[in-house]
């Protein structure tokens, strides 16, 4: 009888254990889906740590190998010449070259192009993450009559090297926008760039589509001016150095290479998120961003693929110039886009079909003193893709 009861208890315990693990795994999967920002922060930190450890091992190995060679050659030289000359090995070493910026007494000329390395660009920025309202920002910059409606500004003492449209995808981040303007607007003025801000706001019930918002922002910005440089800027990324020059170049640029929440490490080589820049010509050549990424994740990886498929490489700032701080979030992030991996596997096939060339939208335009607001209600029907 006791043996029979034991047999009955065993399945019941197994069932309870199975229910417990099912509940735990379901809760974990739900958390990953609805709060991807937290989960992916830890994931990227682990990836970055792995890359750092790997690079350190390589560096240590190279140093040990070099010391062994130096010792061997030193012994040979001392035995032959009875001397201990320093050894000059014929191998390549990479050094971080210090960039020379112009002196304080540099003279500007209104008919000359503004240099890229200006004396006004000092380097580290004093970051203030305290929350403020747009009223405070409006009052702060209202004292500058050179800032025109929509946040348009250009230098008067030299000709801007780049005309830059700053595109900011936006939804329910009202506490972040003034913090970004407090730091970014003065930085761009010190860099002597001609610029304007475009806040592209998504309304409606669909998941956030960051990439499609960038495409909309591009189309609307080009109606205002013949911009030649585009900066795709997350609202919660604050640059820590004004020497991170927001101009474009011969290759697409990834500006935000070291983010504080990832321990200032690049999560993976193909990481292209946060803040990036392309010329108008480059952006059109790659057919813009994909429109098919609804929710968190994947669109930056697809952009990387598009850049590579078009024959470009990605440039990055040297050293600590690409450091950024991330404004803390007070709300849950966007849900995961679970279909991103299937789309990424078909990046090359989709590139000519999904992007600027299949984009449709209806925008409501309003003007703030510091930016042009482009409000759109996005749905998948606005960017349908034919079979590929």
Swiss-Prot record:
EC number: 2.4.1.-, 2.4.1.274
Required cofactor names: Mn(2+)
InterPro entries referenced in this protein's UniProt entry, alphabetically: Galactosyl_T, Galactosyl_T_C, Galactosyl_T_N, Nucleotide-diphossugar_trans
CDD domains in the record: b4GalT
Spans within the Lumenal topological domain: 36-388
Localization terms from the record: Golgi apparatus, Golgi stack membrane; Golgi apparatus
Listed name of the protein: Beta-1,4-galactosyltransferase 5
Higher taxonomy: Eukaryota, Metazoa, Chordata, Craniata, Vertebrata
């Amino acid at each position: 009888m006791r043996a029979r009861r034991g047999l009955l208890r065993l399945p019941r315990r197994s069932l309870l254990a199975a229910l417990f693990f099912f509940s735990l795994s379901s809760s974990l999967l739900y958390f990953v889906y609805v709060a991807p920002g937290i989960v992916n922060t830890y994931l990227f930190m682990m990836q970055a740590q792995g890359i750092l450890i790997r690079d350190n091992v390589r560096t240590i190995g190279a140093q040990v190998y070099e010391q062994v060679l130096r010792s061997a050659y030193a012994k040979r030289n001392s035995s032959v010449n009875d001397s201990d000359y320093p050894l000059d090995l014929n191998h390549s070493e990479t050094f971080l070259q210090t960039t020379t910026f112009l002196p304080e007494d540099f003279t500007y000329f209104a008919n000359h192009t503004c240099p890229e390395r200006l004396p006004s660009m000092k380097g580290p920025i004093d970051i203030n993450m305290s929350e403020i309202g747009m009223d405070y920002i409006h009052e702060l910059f209202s004292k500058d009559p050179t800032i025109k409606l929509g946040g348009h500004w250009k230098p008067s003492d030299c000709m801007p090297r780049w005309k830059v449209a700053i595109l900011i995808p936006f939804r329910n981040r009202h506490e972040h926008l003034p913090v970004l303007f407090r730091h970014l607007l003065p930085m761009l003025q010190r860099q002597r760039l001609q610029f304007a801000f475009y806040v592209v706001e998504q309304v409606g019930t669909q998941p956030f589509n960051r990439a499609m918002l960038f495409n909309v922002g591009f189309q609307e910005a080009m109606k205002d001016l013949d911009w030649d440089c585009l900066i795709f800027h997350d609202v919660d990324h604050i640059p820590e150095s004004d020497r991170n020059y927001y101009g474009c170049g011969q290759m697409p640029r990834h500006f935000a290479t070291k983010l504080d929440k990832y321990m200032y490490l690049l999560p993976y080589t193909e990481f292209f998120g946060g803040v990036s820049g392309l010329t108008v010509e480059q952006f059109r050549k790659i057919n813009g961003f994909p429109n098919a990424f609804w929710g968190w994740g994947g669109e930056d990886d697809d952009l990387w693929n598009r850049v590579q498929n078009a024959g470009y490489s990605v440039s990055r700032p040297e050293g600590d110039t690409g450091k950024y701080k991330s404004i803390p979030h007070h709300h849950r992030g966007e849900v995961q886009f679970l279909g991103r991996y299937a789309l990424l596997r078909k990046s090359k096939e989709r590139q000519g079909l999904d992007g600027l060339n299949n984009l449709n939208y209806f925008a409501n335009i309003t003007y703030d003193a510091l930016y042009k607001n482009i409000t759109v209600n996005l749905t998948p029907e606005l960017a349908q893709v034919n079979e590929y």
